[in-house]
Amino acid sequence: MFAHEEISNSTIDYLIEKVILAMRTHFHGKATLEFTADFHDNAEKMWVNKTSERLTCSKDFYNGVAQRCLDKAEPVSAMHGDLHFGNILYNPYNDSITLLDPRGSYGDHVGCGGDYLYDMCKLSHDLYHGYSELVTGNKYPDYVSWSFSKLVDKYYPTVYNEIIDGGALLIATCIKLHYDCPDRQQRMKDYVNDYAKNISR
């Protein structure tokens, strides 16, 4: 959406906030008792176990981020699981958004339950860290990352650092999945290593 159109800063703010509010209102509600009972084990699989299995670089930093995200994760009734703007359609004629390709699982749980932090970190890896640019070469306007940062601080001030750092973590843990393109893997590896070094200073 942002990569292919001339778009004003106010529209960028509006669209990102619209997605955040939609998730808070329609997805990230109170989880069922059944889902909550096994939440910690499933959250550990999503954050810590997956990180240890896939991580190939800056391991100390990103293992620490994974543990922080696990500590802050809270169960919700529904999450998307792959929430980036490539999976979001906006219809300007009726001001509606459509979410595509939800994950449908969380750890060993099959269904819509999850944690809100994972969804927000997925947005972070796209809007703040530029996942789409790393993969496709299509760069978002610079204002997108600033707008996202501002809105995270507005709606999620207590987990701001986890959302921003967690976005980089999700890039780091998907590098292995891009085995079909070594150049892309190297771009991603360079990015997450540079991010870890700059944050750790």
Language-model regions: role of each:
Residues 2-79, 168-171:
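Conserved kinase catalytic-core helix
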Residues 8, 12, 76-77, 113-116, ...:
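Aromatic-acidic/polar surface patches that form glycan- and anion
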Residues 12, 16, 116-120, 189:
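Amphipathic alpha-helical segments in well-structured domains
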Residues 15-16, 23-24, 153, 192-201:
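Short secondary-structure subsegments characteristic of cysteine-rich extracellular domains
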Residues 20-34, 136, 144-152, 162-164:
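Phosphate/pyrophosphate-binding loops and the adjoining catalytic core of nucleotide-dependent enzymes
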Residues 65-114:
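Active-site acidic catalytic loop and adjacent metal/ATP-binding pocket
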Residues 95, 162-201:
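Regulatory N- and C-terminal appendages and interdomain linkers associated
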Residues 97, 105-156, 168-184:
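Active-site activation/catalytic loop segments of kinase-like enzymes and analogous catalytic loops
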